[in-house]
Amino acid sequence: MTQGKLSVANKAPGTEGQQQVHGEKKEAPAVPSAPPSYEEATSGEGMKAGAFPPAPTAVPLHPSWAYVDPSSSSSYDNGFPTGDHELFTTFSWDDQKVRRVFVRKVYTILLIQLLVTLAVVALFTFCDPVKDYVQANPGWYWASYAVFFATYLTLACCSGPRRHFPWNLILLTVFTLSMAYLTGMLSSYYNTTSVLLCLGITALVCLSVTVFSFQTKFDFTSCQGVLFVLPMTLFFSGLILAILLPFQYVPWLHAVYAALGAGVFTLFLALDTQLLMGNRRHSLSPEEYIFGALNIYLDIIYIFTFFLQLFGTNRE
């Protein structure tokens, strides 16, 4: 009769669920494991393996899901982005407020620069004694050009003087006065009607480009390749014209050069305007208000001078 008994106590590993009856093995029905008791579940002792499903693995956090504090890490160095990241990784109300204050500060400085330049151009255009003096003394032109070039390199290449008050405003004032003198002397060689006409055209073009840059979805800051090739083309074209000028003056070549220059700096105006906005691929740091005003001011001045070459009429 012992053969007919179930061998439970002495069964070998791996023979669970089997019975040995009259020398024959039969499958026993599977019995579900009993759930743990309340004490086992709460104390964690004696918990059977497989009693509960394993906990799901943690989902790795994507960097774009986490808030990054803009004050803790900035992706800018000397006013230019070091990569393809924006200055602000999140655009909260405070970030937008900082950007609006930055844009307001840039355009306030730009307005003062343009008013000073307009006053100098009007003085050199309408006052005959001043106009005759600056044309008779070209040395002041070259001195102003040297000051302009030195201050421009300092403001463009050195982040220290550009960001520290009051040196940034002093350098920008000297730069603006020297550039205003250069623009005024150039305007003195054209008649008053041409100067006024080019001023009006420049104002309309710059206003239209500024409004377009703020409204369009096209990102000019992602076109660095094109905006590098065009100035190189303009530079070599000007070099060829400078070589040909002592031998022969070709009016249509100068007209093409002036049109190309006006177009290139119009594109640069759109680029520099979008750099202020902060919602493009690249944007300026809010600390770079001097650099932003400097770039837009130069764009407007160069557009005006190229329009003078294109539409202006020399004085008789």
Curated annotation (Swiss-Prot):
According to its UniProt record, where is this protein mainly located? membrane
Family to which this protein belongs: Belongs to the BI1 family. LFG subfamily.
Q: Where in the cell is it found?
A: Cell membrane; Membrane raft; Postsynaptic cell membrane
Q: What is an annotated GO biological process for this record, any one?
A: cerebellar Purkinje cell layer development
> Which protein is depicted?
Protein lifeguard 2
Sites carrying a glycan are N191
* Record field: transmembrane: 106-126, 138-158, 165-185, 194-214, 225-245, 250-270, 290-310
Q: Briefly state the protein's biological role.
A: Antiapoptotic protein which protects cells uniquely from Fas-induced apoptosis. Regulates Fas-mediated apoptosis in neurons by interfering with caspase-8 activation. Plays a role in cerebellar development by affecting cerebellar size, internal granular layer (IGL) thickness, and Purkinje cell (PC) development.
Question: Superkingdom of the source?
Answer: Eukaryota
Q: What's its membrane topology?
A: Multi-pass membrane protein
Chain spans, region Disordered: 1-53
How this chain assembles, per its entry, is: Interacts with FAS/TNFRSF6 and BAX.
Q: Which GO terms describe its cellular component?
A: endoplasmic reticulum; Golgi apparatus; membrane raft; postsynaptic membrane
Q: Which UniProt keywords apply?
A: Apoptosis, Cell membrane, Glycoprotein, Membrane, Postsynaptic cell membrane, Synapse, Transmembrane, Transmembrane helix
